Amino acid sequence: MQREKIVVIGAGAFGTALAVVIALENRHDVTLLGRDPSLMADLRNERVHEAALPGVELPDALGFSAEPDVLAGASIVLFAMPSQAHADAAQHYGPYLASDSIIVTCAKGIDRNSGRLLTELLETELPHHPIAVLSGPGFAADIARGLPTAMAIAAEDATVAERLATTISGKTFRLYASTDRIGVQLGGALKNVLAIAAGIVEGAGLGDSARAALISRGLAEMSRLIVAMGGKADTVRGLSGLGDLVLTATSHQSRNLRFGIALGRGEGKDMSGGLVEGAFAAAVAARLGEHHAIDMPVTEAVAAIIDGNLDVASAMQQLMTRPITTE
């Protein structure tokens, strides 16, 4: 395998975890790029990122930089910043990209300003670069600690997807190639919304049966929207759909689940535990459903609760009194 230069942009938990797991293999030259020179210097010198990944040792093979010119010659560039920061990052770093760089978005969200998928946004900002997406069931802490993790990576060109999967995969981090960028992205965004729904049910003490019902009916909503927007139904049953939903809606490592639990308990919109992508994606997903004439009652209820337009008890009453239909 050819040694490649890989740059991960975004020194948060997920970006750092990806940089760590790729660098550990020592098959490629890997650099973590962030905007804070002081932070990047600390990471380089101390070899630990206590704020994002406490207790995880950063490998000697991993480089750190706050200088955009480190992107020169990079064949693969991972965008690991939050979804709402993608447009700014593309504009900031775009001029420094090598002409043949493949861009991989690693965020699980939808641009809330335009309602566009992140691959669409990046294609507008970086029109001369292939754009891929990495998504699936993987918590940053698990990835960084070398716990077995499998995710999906999708590109329009199957050859590009397979190259990325082969290049980035390692002993504990396995990627499956796909050409369904739409399905992989929507699965990653919608599972966050459904994890909030699962958390609301848990926080309100509505029981495991209600949680199972919301997750399964939410999965049906995910499938309908993915197909309506041009994705593949099979993707819903894969890592970026069902796999990520199971993880995010059941594990208390999930920020979205914890956020939902707080809502269910009436504690308000507490985002002190970190970024909650589903809180931004809910309203956008509901609008996409309306635009494509897709019935998405669970997603709409979550969006209304987050916006303060509906309380939990009323939301559950509305869901339970909807007209009876077939599954």
From Swiss-Prot:
PANTHER family: GLYCEROL-3-PHOSPHATE DEHYDROGENASE, GLYCEROL-3-PHOSPHATE DEHYDROGENASE [NAD(+)] 2, CHLOROPLASTIC. Keywords: Cytoplasm, Lipid biosynthesis, Lipid metabolism, NAD, NADP, Nucleotide-binding, Oxidoreductase, Phospholipid biosynthesis, Phospholipid metabolism. NCBIfam families: PRK00094.1-2, PRK00094.1-4. This is Glycerol-3-phosphate dehydrogenase [NAD(P)+]. The keyword Amino-acid biosynthesis does not apply. GO terms for molecular function: glycerol-3-phosphate dehydrogenase [NAD(P)+] activity; NAD binding. Belongs to the NAD-dependent glycerol-3-phosphate dehydrogenase family. It comes from Agrobacterium fabrum (strain C58 / ATCC 33970). The keyword Nucleotide-binding applies. Pfam families: NAD_Gly3P_dh_C, NAD_Gly3P_dh_N. It is an enzyme of class 1 (oxidoreductase). Coiled coil: none annotated.
